[in-house]
Amino acid sequence: MHIGLIGGIGPAATEFYYRGLVNAYAAAERVMDLTIVHSDARQLVKNLSAGDQAAQAQVFLPLVERLQAAGADAVAVTSMGGHFCVTALEAVSPLPVLNVIPTLERYFAGKGIKRVGLLGTRTVMETRVYGGIPAVDCVLPEGPDLDRVHDDYVNMATAASVTDAQRDTFFRVGRDLHARGAEAVMLSGTDLFLAFEGQDCGFPVIDAAEVHIEAIFRWSLGAAEL
């Protein structure tokens, strides 16, 4: 199957998806068929902040059409934040959308996980992953920590690099979520790997992007549902 990715939102997340898929195919000794198109991260942040799902879906639509013209069989958005408009995108997309949200729901059910902490954008956290994992009790950052996590995440994703202060925020808040009963903390923002990769944060972590990448890989081999 030919995979189509909408990237650029942010650039580091795109590279993370690409590297993950390359490694998965190499381990399976298979040849990957992949096309990536670029979307603007600042435009996404603007529409996400405004809650304008229709506008962002219309931004993504010509990119999906470009992927279709390139031969892609389905499309995936390489951003948890970008999934805020996934329902609107599915309604207009000429290609099937490899939606991370039902993938996460199946993942948690399969692992028997009932309570998770969330780190990511304000929208992802406040909507509890867009209401897509109702069987899971989501633990959110409290008080000013929610705004701090959102701001640090957006700044990190836009810059495609993490500062020590930003990493300290994510680790401190993550420890608090774990102390408040979260079985694990889900990295609900794709670029959070910049802060967590290769680090000992002191609490269990589930990377939503890694779950999505594995599902995309399995779908492309015909081994998983959309």
Over which residues does each language-model region extend?
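Non-catalytic structural scaffold of enzyme domains
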Residues: 1-226
